[in-house]
């Protein structure tokens, strides 16, 4: 959800992603709206679109750009790249790019990638992810873990402060965890990301007034105790649910989010809904002040390519309509193309297994076998996406290339329908409505139209489609109001628990399909506490296969392996990663 529900889309191919218990910008583990169009892109920080075509014409340029930008087909360590380039960095200037209005700027309730992109720049937590996706110190300068693996003792950096200069203390850490766990905060992701901490679930349930697992030792020391040792716990603390807020700022004003007092590399300087969101650099940032004076996000809309070519914005993703031109070595813009890594995300159609006809696994399986993912990806999506074979995306920890998954098999699909409780009498099937993100009267995405048509032709099953605005869709999704829905999930942190446990454990708030398998639950719980990584990943491979066999999802697409963005030649230090993390402090303008 960054929804981790993570929205991958800000400028080009729109796939709405939910990450981290929510949604995020893709490419977050976050959930994303899943749409594919010529004008929208879904990918990493910039949302470039990918295309699996012969790109030999652009490869020499891409290779050169990789040295400059750290875009990761052969990037090595981006951290080393940042250090090597620091001596050339120039202070000052503004970066201008397209953006979208955030559903919220409260870190403790955010579940979408658009919100999280801004929140990541304004706030911070005890730890963060670096450009190589390692967990590294943020507000904490160091920590120790007890011998039993359950207690983490964090030592805060000296002289860290909020944007207004107020010192950050261990009491602020304690208060922030208390706030996110307060039922009145109504965080949809607190239990998902913080439920391992002793006392969080009790406070969420209203049976305790405090989170006993978070203890202030002194002004610069705080301990966090979890219920069982878990290899991924530190990674969870990089999600905005764990970000540290200023109690005075939050409690003194109902509109505190419009004047947030964070600890991040940027301050929120201006926000006009539907017009502009402007971030200004925090010169006192404890990890190093940003080079930029400000980052301006244009929220009024516009076509990215046209705005880029007229020098209204400094970077944009490349969509279907423009990709061939950009790949042409005779095109002037070819020299400004940058290759980006594939996002750690998956677009899918979810089915509520408690709602007929999806309470019958034969129907769920039949729909998975009744359309040709490869043809739709190659022809309809023009190679901009690759067919998803399962839940965990390629390149992600515990990805299983040998997963026994779905193929296009019409006869098998028809037999599965006959084997269902509905038999051959399709008139007995309940009406099926697929909910997708979109505006009233807007055209349905080409991939969904193709899939719907395939189901009608191959099986005689007719699907109605209902479009809903993203904010409403997200709330209804969390409330499990949908029989069938198309969305996406982007990684919040690099651990398979972020996909399999958060999305499929029967107790998870993000289990929008209401999937419930006691054997899967037991294996997920076993994987949580397994300390041997190889054994953990073997468990997750087994779990993923069990879920695929029962088909609560229809996996659709992963991000392509060749994604492109356009970046002005004087914009330096723009590093793209497979996940949504803070990146703007590394950027500088050199002209």
Model-derived features: positions:
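Detector for C-terminal structural segments
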Residues: 24, 38, 78, 272, ...
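Gly/Pro-rich hinge or "lid" segments in bacterial periplasmic/extracellular proteins
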Residues: 130, 208-215, 219-220, 225-290, ...
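Ligand-site clamp/hinge motif
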Residues: 251-254, 282-327
């Amino acid at each position: 959800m960054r929804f981790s529900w993570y929205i991958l889309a800000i400028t080009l191919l729109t796939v709405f992603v939910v990450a981290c218990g929510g949604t995020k910008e893709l490419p977050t583990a976050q959930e994303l709206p899943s749409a594919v169009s010529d004008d929208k892109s879904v990918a990493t920080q910039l949302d470039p679109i990918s295309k699996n075509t012969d790109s030999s014409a652009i490869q020499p340029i891409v290779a050169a750009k990789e040295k400059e930008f750290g875009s990761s087909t052969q990037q090595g360590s981006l951290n080393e790249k940042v250090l090597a380039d620091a001596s050339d960095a120039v202070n000052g200037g503004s970066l201008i790019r397209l953006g979208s209005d955030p559903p919220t700027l409260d870190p403790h309730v955010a579940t979408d990638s658009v919100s999280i992109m801004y929140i990541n720049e304004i706030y911070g937590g005890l730890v963060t992810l670096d450009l190589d996706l390692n967990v590294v110190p943020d507000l904490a300068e160091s920590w120790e873990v007890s011998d039993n693996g359950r207690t983490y003792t964090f030592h805060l950096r000296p002289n860290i402060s909020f944007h207004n200069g107020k010192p950050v203390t261990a009491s602020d850490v304690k208060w922030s965890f208390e706030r996110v766990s307060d039922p009145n905060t109504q965080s949809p992701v607190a239990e998902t990301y913080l439920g391992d901490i002793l006392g969080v679930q009790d406070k969420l349930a209203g049976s305790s007034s405090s989170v006993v697992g978070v203890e202030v030792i002194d002004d610069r020391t705080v301990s966090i105790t979890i219920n069982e040792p878990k290899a991924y716990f530190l990674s969870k603390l990089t999600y905005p649910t764990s970000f540290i807020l200023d109690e005075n700022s939050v409690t003194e004003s109902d509109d505190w989010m419009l004047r947030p007092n964070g600890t991040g590399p940027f301050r929120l300087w201006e926000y006009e809904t539907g017009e502009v969101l402007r971030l200004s650099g925090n010169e006192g940032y404890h990890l190093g002040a940003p080079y930029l004076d400000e980052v301006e996000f244009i929220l009024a809309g516009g076509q990215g390519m046209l705005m880029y070519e007229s020098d209204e914005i400094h970077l944009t993703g490349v969509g279907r309509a423009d990709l061939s031109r950009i790949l042409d070595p005779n095109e002037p813009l070819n020299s400004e193309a940058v290759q980006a890594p594939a996002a750690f995300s998956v677009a899918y159609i979810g089915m509520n297994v408690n709602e007929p006809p999806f309470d019958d696994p034969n129907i769920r399986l039949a729909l998975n076998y009744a359309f040709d993912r490869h043809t739709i990806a190659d022809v309809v999506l023009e190679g901009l996406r690759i067919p998803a074979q399962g839940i965990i995306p390629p390149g992600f920890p515990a990805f299983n290339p040998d997963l026994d998954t779905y193929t296009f098999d019409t006869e098998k699909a028809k037999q599965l329908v006959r084997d269902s409780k509905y038999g051959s009498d399709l008139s007995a099937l309940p009406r099926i409505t697929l909910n997708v993100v979109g505006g009233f009267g807007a055209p349905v995405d080409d991939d969904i139209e193709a899939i719907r048509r395939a189901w009608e032709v191959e099986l005689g099953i007719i699907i109605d489609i209902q479009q809903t605005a993203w904010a409403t869709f997200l709330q209804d999704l969390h409330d499990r109001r949908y029989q069938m829905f198309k969305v996406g999930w982007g990684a919040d942190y690099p651990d398979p628990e972020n996909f399999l446990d958060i999305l499929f454990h029967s107790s998870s708030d993000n289990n929008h399909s209401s999937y419930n398998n006691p054997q899967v639950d037991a294996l997920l719980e076993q994987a949580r506490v397994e300390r041997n990584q190889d054994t953990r990943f073997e468990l997750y491979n087994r779990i993923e296969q069990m879920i695929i066999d029962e088909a609560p999802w229809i996996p659709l697409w992963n991000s392509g392996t060749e994604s492109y963005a356009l970046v002005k030649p004087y914009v330096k230090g723009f590093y793209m990663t497979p996940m949504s993390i803070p990146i703007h402090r590394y950027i500088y303008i050199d002209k």
